[in-house]
Amino acid sequence: MKDKILKIVRTTKETDISAELKIYGEGRCEIATGVGFFDHMLEAFGKHALLDMKISCKGDTHVDFHHSVEDVGIVIGTLLKEAIYPVSGIERFGDSVVVMDEAAVSCALDLSNRAFLVYENFNEKGKVGEFDIELAEEFFRAVSMNANITLHIAKLRGRNNHHIIEAAFKSFAVALRRALAKNPRVNTPSTKGVL
C-alpha cells in the first residue's frame, strides 16, 4: 500500500489528463473534466471514499463526452492499482448500499488484483444535463479494469436518473473506503498468500 500522493499524466489524440491521488486522504477534490455532471460525481466519489484527488482533463467534448469519461476512469484505475498492490494490512473486501431519495444502489468489491465488472439493473436511457447516463458504466468499467478490482454495482430501485447515478458513485466510494480500511491483524488477506 502506498500512502502518498501518486501522479500521472496521460495524453492521447482524444484527451490530455493530469491527475493526483492519495488513497488515505480527507476527501479533498479539485476536478475539472469539462463535463459538469461528471465533475459533480467525481467530487462525490472522492468525498465519500476519503480520497484526495486532483483531476484535469481536456478532451474532445465537442465530439462526445465518452472519451473524457472513459479516459478519466483509466487514469483513476491506474492510480488506484499503483496505490493498492501488493495488498497488505487492509480489509480487502468492501460493500455498501447508498440511498438518494427514491434511488438505492448497492456496491460490493474485492481488491483482488482481478479485474471484473458487473453492472446490473441500469436500464435507464437519456441524459442528466448533457451527460449520457450510459457513460457511468463506461467509467466504472475503466476503473475496475485498470485498477484490477472486482466490482459489482446494482440498482435496487430508483426513477430519477440523477439520483440513481449519484447513488452508484457514492456506493462505490463507501465500499472502496471500507475495503481500504487498515487492519493491523491482516497481513496478506488471501489464503494464497499473495494478491
From Swiss-Prot:
<dbReference type="Pfam" id="PF00475">
    <property type="entry name" value="IGPD"/>
</dbReference>
<keyword id="KW-0368">Histidine biosynthesis</keyword>
<protein>
    <recommendedName>
        <fullName>Imidazoleglycerol-phosphate dehydratase</fullName>
        <ecNumber>4.2.1.19</ecNumber>
    </recommendedName>
</protein>
<dbReference type="GO" id="GO:0005737">
    <property type="term" value="C:cytoplasm"/>
</dbReference>
<keyword id="KW-0963">Cytoplasm</keyword>
<keyword id="KW-0456">Lyase</keyword>
<keyword id="KW-0028">Amino-acid biosynthesis</keyword>
<dbReference type="InterPro" id="IPR000807">
    <property type="entry name" value="ImidazoleglycerolP_deHydtase"/>
</dbReference>
<comment type="pathway">
    <text>Amino-acid biosynthesis; L-histidine biosynthesis; L-histidine from 5-phospho-alpha-D-ribose 1-diphosphate: step 6/9.</text>
</comment>
<dbReference type="GO" id="GO:0004424">
    <property type="term" value="F:imidazoleglycerol-phosphate dehydratase activity"/>
</dbReference>
<comment type="similarity">
    <text>Belongs to the imidazoleglycerol-phosphate dehydratase family.</text>
</comment>
<dbReference type="InterPro" id="IPR020565">
    <property type="entry name" value="ImidazoleglycerP_deHydtase_CS"/>
</dbReference>
<dbReference type="GO" id="GO:0000105">
    <property type="term" value="P:L-histidine biosynthetic process"/>
</dbReference>
<dbReference type="InterPro" id="IPR020568">
    <property type="entry name" value="Ribosomal_Su5_D2-typ_SF"/>
</dbReference>
<dbReference type="InterPro" id="IPR038494">
    <property type="entry name" value="IGPD_sf"/>
</dbReference>
